[in-house]
Every structure is written in C-alpha cells, then in structure tokens.
Amino acid sequence: MEPHRPNVKTAVPLSLESYHISEEYGFLLPDSLKELPDHYRPWMEIANKLPQLIDAHQLQAHVDKMPLLSCQFLKGHREQRLAHLVLSFLTMGYVWQEGEAQPAEVLPRNLALPFVEVSRNLGLPPILVHSDLVLTNWTKKDPDGFLEIGNLETIISFPGGESLHGFILVTALVEKEAVPGIKALVQATNAILQPNQEALLQALQRLRLSIQDITKTLGQMHDYVDPDIFYAGIRIFLSGWKDNPAMPAGLMYEGVSQEPLKYSGGSAAQSTVLHAFDEFLGIRHSKESGDFLYRMRDYMPPSHKAFIEDIHSAPSLRDYILSSGQDHLLTAYNQCVQALAELRSYHITMVTKYLITAAAKAKHGKPNHLPGPPQALKDRGTGGTAVMSFLKSVRDKTLESILHPRG
C-alpha cells in the first residue's frame, strides 16, 4: 500500500491475544466501562448530558468551568479508553457546538491537557477516532443477552437521537461480524507457514463468508439511520480539523502547543478490519488512496496497527497460491476478493444515500427540526477525503487483484 515499509517476511505464527484482539469480539473492547473513578465526576456529569447541552448551546460554558484534572488516577486500560472516549466527545461537542460557521478555534487547557495526556498514554491522537466512537462506545443492556442491536446501547452520545445510536451500534455489529474473518486470516497465515493447503482452503472459505456477513449487517443502516439526520445533524460532530475548509488552520490545544494542531476526523478507514483483509489478500491501492489509508493507521490503537503490519510482513498469500498451482485455492482466493469488492460497492451505495443524495436534498431546503447542514465537507468524508473518488478507487483496485492461473 505504501513504499516506505520494510518488506521483511516473518515466519512467526500469529495469535490474536498478542495484539489485544478478543476471540469473541474482535477489535471491539470487551466489557467497556460506563463510569470513571469519582475524581473524574466533572467530566462524566457533562458527558452524560452532552446532547442536551449542545442543543441548548451551553456545552462550551460548562466545559469552561470544568476543573483541570490529571489523568494519574486512571487505572488500567479500560479506564484510559473510557477517558479518551469521554474527552473526545467533549472536544467534538465543544468545537462544533455552534456549527461549522463558528467552530471553536481554541480548546481550553482544562480539556486539552488531560485529553493529550490520556492520548499519549494510549498511543492515540487527541481527537475522536473510530476506537472511541465504536470500539469502546457500546454496552449490553442485558449482560447475558445476545450481541444484537436491540440489546445494545451507547455509553456517550451526541445529538442525533436514535439515528446516532443506530449509526454507532450497526458499525459495532459490523466489527462483530468481522471476527470470524479476522480469525480466518490468522488461521490462513499459519496454514501457509505449516504448510497445510486444506486448512488454508477452509480459512479462505470462512473469510469469504465473514465478508459477506459484514455486507449484510451494514445494510441495517437503512433500518436505523435517517439520512437527513445523519447528514445535517450527526456528521459535523465526526469532522476533524485537517483537510477541512471550515478549520483551515487547525485547532489550538491550549497549554499543549504554541501552534494549532491538525487531525483528521473519524472515518471508517480507521477500522482495522479492512486494512487487515487488504494486507492478507495482497491488495495494493493507488498512491493517493494508499497514503490516506496508511495515515489512518496512526488513528488506531497501537496493538491493532501492529497486527496489520505483521499481516503485511507474513509470507505472501498470493505468491503461495500462484506457486502452488492449485486451482481450488485460486478460486477460493478470488471469491474473497470478489466479496470484498462487493462490500466496497455496497459501501459506495450507502455513502451515495447518506452523503451525496442527502446533500442534494439539503440544498433544496432542510427539515425544520435540523440544524443547517455542513457545507465545508459536503462532498468529502469526515476524514477529509474526496469520498466518492476515494471509495471507487479502493473498490476498483480490489477488483484488479483477481488472480489468473499462470501458464
């Protein structure tokens, strides 16, 4: 995907546990906490009222009165992750409370300093990332019940009501559907090392089924997310301050830096799932798309980024299949690539509905109950990309990866 990575092939068997990837939940954080220690009650009290405070244009005033708290009393990974989730939501709400016409240019030190501190502890940037919005931001209503949307709720929220909850929780279910695929690519990588062609074939078949299940689950967006609400009411709170015309200079983190800092907004490209699939299948994207995707890895938990890099460093699946001369392996590989291309085509139809069509509709008059839709990113993803050309390029490069028998 990018030229500057060392091309060292590893022969060490992979295991999910060593990358803090759950056997049951994949990249989702199992047993996310809902409360921080009492010392951080000032954060939680505001975070739990976030939608109401933003709607009343009172969030900035409440944040400005917050005490400056150190992160030293956060114990363990889950408390750190919840703190990052809470502070990221406070930050996005603070910056975008008045919409894109009046974004906050300075993040006050009582929010900026602890946010940067916990971000450094976790190896994450000080902005809302996919890890916050989705991977950490879910809990079961009934702990013994199934992982399905009726039994899930978010921990922290923005304005957007049920559509916002649906967007987050359907995305969490997509991550859950990826778990068999993540396990399959580990099994396949280890099968190449053994080598065991039968185990490799079975793993490729499981990967294809997982990708197809991801596509089906993504379709639940239609049931739970209203396009008008997503476009005009939710999307702005996922927007960053890099490649965003509404904030060309970036955001000043008071007490952290003398210059404004620039970070990309939340993006599906920050999900580790498709990066891992691409590396395993040997899919190479165009320089522009590849550079953006590679940069998004810095917005992932470091252990998840390391997983992608180790998949990249593993022996090449494509080379192994071509050298094996086994048509059934080549067919199974191509079915995985085809399924991935179909997933990406479906994603394009979703973006067309929730971004392109919704933007055109908003241009001709917004519903009275929604704020004015953001214009600065009207044809761009919240990560700052020219979204349709990016998605089509990624889909087309996936299709170009179809293998043909040698000879």
Swiss-Prot record:
<protein>
    <recommendedName>
        <fullName>Indoleamine 2,3-dioxygenase 2</fullName>
        <ecNumber>1.13.11.-</ecNumber>
    </recommendedName>
</protein>
<dbReference type="InterPro" id="IPR000898">
    <property type="entry name" value="Indolamine_dOase"/>
</dbReference>
<dbReference type="GO" id="GO:0020037">
    <property type="term" value="F:heme binding"/>
</dbReference>
<dbReference type="GO" id="GO:0033754">
    <property type="term" value="F:indoleamine 2,3-dioxygenase activity"/>
</dbReference>
<keyword id="KW-0391">Immunity</keyword>
<dbReference type="GO" id="GO:0002376">
    <property type="term" value="P:immune system process"/>
</dbReference>
<comment type="function">
    <text>Catalyzes the first and rate limiting step of the catabolism of the essential amino acid tryptophan along the kynurenine pathway. Involved in immune regulation. May not play a significant role in tryptophan-related tumoral resistance.</text>
</comment>
<dbReference type="GO" id="GO:0046872">
    <property type="term" value="F:metal ion binding"/>
</dbReference>
<keyword id="KW-0408">Iron</keyword>
<dbReference type="GO" id="GO:0004833">
    <property type="term" value="F:tryptophan 2,3-dioxygenase activity"/>
</dbReference>
<dbReference type="InterPro" id="IPR037217">
    <property type="entry name" value="Trp/Indoleamine_2_3_dOase-like"/>
</dbReference>
<keyword id="KW-0349">Heme</keyword>
<dbReference type="GO" id="GO:0005829">
    <property type="term" value="C:cytosol"/>
</dbReference>
<feature type="binding site" description="proximal binding residue">
    <location>
        <position position="347"/>
    </location>
    <ligand>
        <name>heme</name>
    </ligand>
</feature>
<dbReference type="GO" id="GO:0034354">
    <property type="term" value="P:'de novo' NAD biosynthetic process from L-tryptophan"/>
</dbReference>
<keyword id="KW-0560">Oxidoreductase</keyword>
<keyword id="KW-0223">Dioxygenase</keyword>
<dbReference type="GO" id="GO:0019441">
    <property type="term" value="P:L-tryptophan catabolic process to kynurenine"/>
</dbReference>
<dbReference type="GO" id="GO:0005737">
    <property type="term" value="C:cytoplasm"/>
</dbReference>
<dbReference type="Pfam" id="PF01231">
    <property type="entry name" value="IDO"/>
</dbReference>
<comment type="similarity">
    <text>Belongs to the indoleamine 2,3-dioxygenase family.</text>
</comment>
<keyword id="KW-0479">Metal-binding</keyword>
<keyword id="KW-0823">Tryptophan catabolism</keyword>
<comment type="pathway">
    <text>Amino-acid degradation; L-tryptophan degradation via kynurenine pathway; L-kynurenine from L-tryptophan: step 1/2.</text>
</comment>
